[in-house]
Amino acid sequence: MRLSSSSGSVLPAQAASPEAVEEQKCLNSELWHACAGPLVSLPAVGSRVVYFPQGHSEQVAASTNKEMESQIPNYPNLPPQLICQLHNVTMHADAETDEVYAQMTLQPLSPQELKDPYLPAELGSANKQPTNYFCKTLTASDTSTHGGFSVPRRAAEKVFPPLDFTQQPPAQELIAKDLHGNEWKFRHIFRGQPKRHLLTTGWSVFVSAKRLVAGDSVLFIWNDNNQLLLGIRRANRPQTVMPSSVLSSDSMHIGLLAAAAHAASTNSRFTIFYNPRASPSEFVIPLSKYVKAVYHTRISVGMRFRMLFETEESSVRRYMGTITGISDLDAARWPNSHWRSVKVGWDESTAGERQPRVSLWEIEPLTTFPMYPSPFPLRLKRPWPTGLPSLHGGKDDDLTSSLMWLRDSANPGFQSLNFGGLGMNPWMQPRFDASLLGLQPDMYQTIAATAFQDPTKQVSPTILQFQQPQNIGGRANTLLPSQILQQVQPQFQQQQYLQNINETTIQGHAQSEFLQQQLQRCQSFTEQKPQLQTQQQQQESQQQQQQQSQCMQVPQHQQMQQQKNMTNYQSVPNALSPFSQLSSPSQSSPMTLQTVLPFSQPQSYPDTSMSSLSPSNTSTMHNALRPFSSEAPSHLSMPRPTAVPVPDPWSSKRVAVESLLPSRPQVTSQMEQLDSTAPSIPQSSALAPLPGRGCLVDQDGNSDPQNHLLFGVNIDSQSLLMQGGIPSLQGENDSTAIPYSTSNFLSPSQNDFPLDQTLSSADCLDESGYVPCSQNSDQVINRPPATFVKVYKSGTYGRSLDITRFSSYHELRRELGRLFGLEGQLENPLRSGWQLVFVDREDDVLLVGDDPWQEFVNSVSCIKILSPQEVQQMGKPFELLSSAPGKRLGSSCDDYVSRQESRSLSTGIASVGSVEF
């Protein structure tokens, strides 16, 4: 076993004798990991791992101080990374030197297992590093035959049992066990000038027996069983003379390559030995860690990164660097290998001690958490619930499309793997019938298909005809695809643009049972078509007369003020582009706001097999559909009521988006030519409501335009309606006009419609999206600068904390530990497993402690306490920071918006402003 630990060779599985294994004592895992180092964590038995022969060769070279020579035969059948099943892990320690190493039994996966569409990718075991211990590097006086071992005061008080200070001098006897179970007795005394903690009697015996020298380290651990454990770490001193019994370096290299190649070809088990103190890097890593780093973290030359390194006395430190290149380490022998494929340059002058090349899974790019790209450009504010219908299909090429950034020489086999257990592709989760929740997914699929003008992706023409309400305020008047193309293409010459968009259209789902029932009901309405047309014409004429008579009574200055207000809210009509532009009737709109006529003029459509409806029949149909799409009617040109009614929690989501036009000059010239002849296109169309969520207003004035994409269309963040948020959040002089509004295409005199009066003022949204309370709008605008930040921890209620009370990270961690019952665990996150992250003002998620304190105070928005389990499951990006645990009472609307604007840890995908589902 000593040969195995020092050489790190590969042996067939049969070479490990069961009798020899039984003779090995069960080592203490906590003490073994402490001796191995703070960054070492062995994978879990039974999990899938990735084995790198290159890394194994580096361990042999480091142990023998001899690199692998070129005359060593190559094994073309041995891939640069081998996915294996980890069958067994045994921890060992050398009997003479206490050098720790691990024996692992691996078995390569068969080709059939690699093709498994749901290949498990376990996250591996938790880091078994101890939490209550101290490590000290020995000095010359510590290793001398007199004087004893000086223990730092805080370390002695933390790890050793308390002294009895009634004695003079205070003293006690300590009994500590090493890795082999041997007990060592020391006398612990508190004496001297100044007084200090010393280990006297028994210490020199221990130093002599272990042959410790200055530079070596000693660890004392107080475990959960109230036992004192003792371990040593020897300084990395290169061996000048290898024992004659040890095999040559070339023999070791050939042995490990031959054993791995044979196991890969025969799908048999093989055994390796991992020496964490001698190996430069881990060469057996969990499969999930490999996939997350290689296929779900985007890097580029020039990107900044940080990397953890072990420092003195078992502590760790992050060193900064810059990526200078991405290439194979040994393209001739190991092509397409990800082992040390990243060239880096280190910032500090001591960079000579660190490797010039690193692997992807060893570094942390200075961005948000790793990106999990989706084939659809819509980024959800909340995790997509399991079973809810998604806006895209779960095709096999969805995963591969997100991996196009990889080098062309990358192994395509890994791209076909679906790691569903990590939550990397939520669209692959099982779904149930959306009608159980009262949803109408097909209506949204139809809208998306209509927007891109792909008739093959549409559910049915009859569903499009359901989208023909009569009221202008927040209603849509949708045409069939053939009629839309006839109207739009001659005007805007968009054939090539639509052809490109058709390639990215979304597949619609089958019609829901609800729509089929409503269609059957509406078929009976067609028999009453003449009567309904007559009634509709009478209602329209009466409504027109009432509007004109009321508008005559409005003073002229009030009309001008009303038009001015409507211009301010130009960006917030109930419109959805591009199909708001593609769904106009074939008649022009009036020129003034006071004489607006309804769009719902009778039109005829070709009959379909399911009895298509004319617009005159839709009034009765909307009464039937009202429970699922309840909107209070918009009153055009009516005075604003003083009493604001409480909005319906099922009120529709309304968004206003920019027009899909090639360029401003081209559109302006075209609009001037079409001013007198082309029909005016309404900019209002309604999107049927999704239950339980309301649109939010993006209050960030410096929004990134890439953060507002819906169906591939840029959305102006200021044009998103919030239930009750517009009057309080927008001033009268804040003009947010839609682009191209200077042309006749979106002239204010033609398309200024008042907002729906059912929107209340400054209504507060709770976590479920409903409106439980109402607050004064002045409280939203004139809210004093907040010095409190929200702190969240899973399983408990959130807390508010004034961070200006503290002057350092240590005080903050201590206070958070007291508030959440985590005393002593937040100060040492790497040992306890608990981690602190925060969201800054730019919605980036960062680790607490990396920035200067004052910069952190000025930029922090909220803090999240992550448990060890959450830190383990960082591969599930949609679960972290997506929502605060517990119900937070009394929050204002802007607090709610700021929480929803926080980006999650796994995602990194551009936000869609305030669109929520």
From Swiss-Prot:
Q: Where is this region: Disordered?
A: 571-649
Q: Where is the composition biased (Low complexity)?
A: 576-594, 604-620
Q: Which SUPFAM superfamilies match?
A: CAD & PB1 domains (SSF54277), DNA-binding pseudobarrel domain (SSF101936)
Chain residues forming the annotated DNA-binding region? 134-236
* Regions crossing the membrane: none
Location comes to: Nucleus
Give start and end of each PB1 domain: 786-870
Please give the Pfam families that the UniProt record associates with this protein. Answer: ARF_AD, AUX_IAA, B3
Q: What is a single cellular component term in the Gene Ontology annotation?
A: nucleus
Q: Name one GO biological process term.
A: auxin-activated signaling pathway
> From the Swiss-Prot or TrEMBL record, what is one GO molecular function term?
DNA binding
Cystine pairs annotated here are none
Which family is this sequence assigned to? Belongs to the ARF family.
Query: Domain comment?
Result: Interactions between auxin response factors (ARFs) and Aux/IAA proteins occur through their C-terminal dimerization domains III and IV.
How does this protein assemble? Homodimers and heterodimers.
Q: What is this protein called?
A: Auxin response factor 17
What lineage does UniProt assign to this protein's organism? Eukaryota, Viridiplantae, Streptophyta, Embryophyta, Tracheophyta
